[in-house]
Amino acid sequence: MKFLKRGVALALLAAFALTTQPAQAYEKDKTYKITILHTNDHHGHFWRSEYGEYGLAAQKTLVDSIRKEVAQEGGSVLLLSGGDINTGGPESDLQDAEPDFRGMNLIGYDAMAVGNHEFDNPLTVLRQQEKWAKFPFLSANIYQKSTGERLFKPWAIFTRQDIKIAVIGLTTDDTAKIGNPEYFTDIEFRKPAEEAKVVIQELNMNEKPDVIIATTHMGHYDNGDHGSNAPGDVEMARSLPAGSLAMIVGGHSQDPVCMASENKKQVNYVPGTPCAPRSEE
């Protein structure tokens, strides 16, 4: 599918072998098949381009096909977005991305991380987009300065095959310096890794999920070499206690992260071909 050339990563979490926590709804020593589909950096491309690329109609065709295939194998699907729905196509920008969010509803997105480009518009526009969307906008590290309260839900809970899955949202703290400063007078972007530690602790104490994953808009930088950018997914994964997160599905840097072998990234990846995700021990 040509629209896969921009921002679509399919991360398959084929099975959870959950055997460590007692008194849960799942059966001990049973393998559960849960497929996690993830897209990021959509940037207003709800419409198919003149080159046959992009378009939410094509994306729905693909997602529906995968859902059917997974269901036939007895599995379940969770569909996440790494954010940056906004900014890129005038047909979207001039409508405040309403077609994009309504299209994502039809595809069946479960949750979305808030991206930096969501703040290319005033907060009032973002709140309207939340009303259009039938899925939660997640970010644990964006706060309102005047109240000290988070602006968005930090997490969402989903149940797939009796498995309780917590999804945390996180946003790059670079947003404040790369966005329009007039929109941030009462908004604070805290360090995502530090907020992740707090949220994971809160989840384990209060919600007791079987699995915790993060959908982020922070960027992936090889070996954590983020340069002048704020730290991304790799640095956060290394800063957290082992086993804190089962998976990170991210966006922002828009680089495919496909592994040829352990600790060896695949070079010259061709969109649409198989992509083995990275494992950070």
Regions found by a protein language model. Give the residues of each.
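Gram-negative bacterial Sec-dependent N-terminal signal peptides
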Residues: K2-P22
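Generic enzyme active-site microenvironment
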Residues: T39, G82, T215
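Short catalytic helix/loop segments, enriched in acidic residues and glycine
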Residues: Y51-S65, N105, E188-A196
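Well-ordered alpha-helical segments embedded in enzymatic catalytic cores
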Residues: A58-L62, P99, V125, E195-V199, ...
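Short, high-confidence coil segments that cap the C-terminus of an alpha-helix
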Residues: G74-S76, Y109, K208-P209
